[in-house]
A protein has these predicted regions:
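Acidic/histidine-rich alpha-helical segments that form the ligand environment
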Residues: 23-51, 106-147
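Serine/threonine-rich low-complexity intrinsically disordered regions
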Residues: 13-16, 28-29, 55, 101, ...
């Protein structure tokens, strides 16, 4: 049985976490994690292609109070900076200012140098997002199996590398679900 990162289990609940683990979402080996990352990347590539067919202002629209498409990409920049940069690499380079934290972590925006009220253009956010996504793929390439069990001690806790990678894969998967749902609504609401 695959070991799922404890914060994910807490967020999803044990039954849902086990169900998703059974679908290969929470691999605990490099090959499985890299495969899940590639699958997420393919899903996002298709969805971003759909998004690029919309006027940029539509990608800044919120649906039912959820983040806009561009805000979701900004959040995924934050996710990568947190789990890969801060946790796995224990980087001191900091966060990209366009990263968007979840509401429960908004108190840390200032100390992390995040400009949550910024309104960068979609293509600028997409370029940063694509660079972060490529960086995750590079990290997966250079890790070896023993690295997965390394304990990382960033500023806010203690995590295994495998758990941090599971968190990134899960966030990418979950936010793709939300972004796709909302993009479908925007397409329907703004069809010619």
């Amino acid at each position: 049985m695959v070991s799922v990162h404890p914060p994910i289990v807490g967020f999803l609940g044990p039954e849902r976490a086990e169900e998703l683990a059974g679908k290969g979402l929470f691999a605990d080996d490099l090959e499985g994690l890299a495969s899940a990352w590639r699958t997420n990347g393919q899903r996002w590539t298709s969805t971003v292609t759909r998004a690029l067919a919309r006027p940029p202002e539509q990608l800044a629209l919120r649906v039912d109070g959820e983040w806009a498409f561009v805000e979701t990409l900004r959040h995924l920049i934050f996710v990568t900076d947190t789990w890969v940069g801060d946790v796995i690499e224990e980087s001191t380079e900091g966060y990209h200012p366009w990263g968007l934290p979840p509401d429960f972590f908004a108190h840390a925006a200032g100390p992390l140098g995040l400009a949550v009220d910024a309104t960068p253009a979609f293509d600028e956010v997409l370029a940063v997002r694509e660079a972060r996504s490529s960086h995750v793929a590079e990290v997966l390439e250079r890790l070896d199996p023993a690295d997965l069990q390394r304990t990382c001690v960033p500023r806010d806790g203690q995590f295994l590398v495998v758990g941090a990678l599971q968190a990134v894969v899960f966030e990418e998967w979950a936010h793709h679900e939300y972004a796709t749902r909302d993009l479908t609504t925007i397409e329907a609401d703004h069809s010619a």
